[in-house]
Amino acid sequence: MNEQAIQEQYQHIVTLLKQQRLKEAQSQLEAFLWNSGDWTLRNRLEQAQTSYQYMLQYMRQGIDDPERQKLYRQILTETWEVADQARLSLLDGVSTHYYHSLRNNRERLPKEYNIAALQKVLESFPDDLAVCQLMPDNQGMDAVLQRHEQTAQVLFLSTWSNSDWSAEDEQQAKGLLESEMLPVNDLCLFTSAVMLSLMECFDTRKFSWLLDAVTHANTQVNQRALVGIAFALLFHPTRLSLYPELTARLSLLNEDGSFGKQLNRIYIELLRSQETEKIDKKMREEIIPEMMRNVNIMRNMKFGFEENPEENDLNPDWEKAFESSGLGDKIREMNELQLEGADVYMSTFAQLKTYPFFKEPYNWFYPFDMHHSSIIKEFGFKPTGDNAILSLILQSGFFCNSDKYSLCFTMAHIPQSQRTMMLSQMTSQDLDALMDESKSSALRQYAERPDVISNQYVHDLYRFFKLSQRRHEFRDIFKEEIALHRIPALKDILCKPELCLLYTSPSPRDRQK
């Protein structure tokens, strides 16, 4: 069978399961499995068929069984899970997608490359890096960075391609959440891998892990987990009805209503992201052309990089020209959109995703890190001068992670004079304010807000699904209707008057009111 035939047959089986036509679904799945050489899946289906036959036999005999509904749900669940694995197994044999090439290469990984073993390597990184800093010329740092990044990559790819966690996998994954030595960026990357894996195939253990991760103390981790839960439910809107223990955990998380409020915020951010193309068009056709038409005004505006602080005020004549040109309205509109959380930088950075760094899928999900080898290569371990200013800007919450990497790679390849000019035009912050400890601290605090972190992560995901080289291999949820409040498992959590008012507003600006 080719990919299309596999997908169509799988969807037919799923439709039968949703309609609770279990016997027909099992018959279709049996035929489906004849194309697969996986005897484990065949045995699992045979056991499910036998259990269902016994249940029907007892019903015909009039035997009362108070556990019948529970047993039926378990048989239906098992049948669905077998169908999931059968689909992947068959696609592994014919698909050229990166995900399936990863699955086909999983057997080449040494058995000792489990989550726990990789965790130990990652945990050693901070100490190894500290030792290198004490050595002359940071001796050995390249090897330490390479080892760390390759290990994080293996963990990401092996987690993404593992469609069915064992109990041992789940336990080891919980160890990552409990570790006090694991670098936060590595845990963030792992959280994204769990989400990607759930997008390919529903796995109760991974979903349960995300529910654990939502309560993690680190904001970057718990916000990624929240977004991961939203994506998993958008990809599998009805599956949780088969797992009452997961539904119960969702309800427990929302006992005080805080989980619902946070998930609702993620919901709004996802809805807002669907308006990015409109904003992008507005930027390209209205705002940027207006700025280009008034380039002389822009050039004569004072952005805080002048030697004489007394000259920092805008010349009144230029200010008058600035307002009469209409440029002031355009810039204010852009600022308002940005304050609302809109993705105003997509048009700017869309053309800057061709660097080699972005050829690897996992790099799209790695939090920005000035100590990443690709950044150290361009700016050194301790940025100075204009690079230090750039570093401060990158600590703010103005750009998502992938845009920060793009900005660094772009800055590294332009002359110093142009770099200074670009920095002055990319921020309205005064240089003194940037270098002032209290104000730079305020920027960092802004960047650490949960709503800023989750919104920037949604921007990262949007770029991955729209711009990555392998974007056509993924289902783009941003092209579809996003209706989290209609998902059965979330009705009691999101369908509350104070929350419904927010996501049913006609525009992002209204939603924020």
Go through the PLM ranges and name each one.
Residues 1-11:
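Generic start-of-chain signal for non-secretory N-termini
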Residues 6-8, 21-27, 34-129, 149-153, ...:
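Non-TPR docking regions that flank or precede TPR/alpha-solenoid scaffolds in eukaryotic proteins
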Residues 13, 174, 195, 230, ...:
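Conserved small-residue packing positions in alpha-helical repeats and bundles
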Residues 17, 198-202, 500-501:
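Hydrophobic/aromatic side-chain positions at a characteristic register within alpha-helices
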Residues 136-187, 192-205:
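Alpha-helical solenoid scaffolds in large eukaryotic transport, assembly, and signaling factors
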Residues 173-181, 189-245, 252:
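Extended amphipathic alpha-helical scaffold segments
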Residues 503-512:
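Conserved small/polar residues in nucleotide/adenosyl-binding loops
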